[in-house]
Amino acid sequence: MNASTSTGTAVPTTPRLTSLSHGGGCGCKIAPGVLSELLAKSNLPKQFFPDLLVGTETADDAAVYKINDEQAIVATTDFFMPIVDDPYDFGRIAATNALSDIYAMGGTPLMALAIVGMPINMLPHDVIAKILEGGESVCRDAGIPLAGGHSIDSVEPIYGLVGIGIVNPKQMKRNADAKAGDVLILGKPLGVGILSAALKKNLLDEAGYAAMISATTQLNRPGADLSKLDGVHALTDVTGFGLLGHALELARGAQLSAHIDSAHLPVLPDVQSLAEQGIFTGASGRNWASYGEHIQIDSSVSDARKALLTDPQTSGGLLVSCAADAAEQVLKVFADSGFGEAAVIGHMESGEAKVFVR
């Protein structure tokens, strides 16, 4: 890609990172319905390893392998294409998102490996270096080494991490153990996908961008502390399938109904007005097409609010299912860690494994 000077000399220009990918962030995920179909057709054999505590049988955030009665390894991988144009911010967001899966299991990160795919002949090497630096800065913030990785020359920019963590098997939290009567608490405000769509359309101002970066680069550290609370029954993080998709996973895992109060959702600045203007990602529609038949939304809920409920979150917040009498303690753990917008957004009830929204 070139631009011309006043003398007519061709000068190479750096393309916007988001212009090099067909999607960005966790909105790149294969739609949940399509993924289920692919896995069903793959005929993967069931695995019987007594020390594999969490594998492919459930929709959990990471694999967990028991080492002894007090320690288990948590392993996950996550990567995607750019959600922003700033390379350093892209690296930070991707790394924060990858480590979130460890926190969502109640674990503590130990180390990470980088996954790097870059169009080497299209991106200046100093841009790629900034992506790597952004990822390393998050690992440093998490107190872990970025110990290596693997790279390829790819058509679209891809960056992420393999994350390795540790958890006490007795304190590990899954997304399938919610109980009837639990309240649902969301740790971060929603709207990252809508803000990223606005960014691509040049409709996002500096304040909106700053809010998006702040949310997506905030490590979900409270997960490790929440896992130690007896009243916390289930834990996951809200990412590419949107709040409804991950709430549905909680409902299916526990064979309960999840009930969401849309009026109580924490929302990033400007997101509601952008949604009312029809700004949202293609992944939002794909999410609804995949699981909409299992969602019941009250007629009073606006279309803009519905878009927010299916909005793919990149490096989204923890979704906690806890006993009602533990809610205050859970909110305090969030607040003490800088998650001041954490809020009670619903509850779990006995009933059909669906999500009900009012």
Model segments located where?
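Helix-biased detector of long, well-ordered alpha-helical tracts
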Residues: 2-358
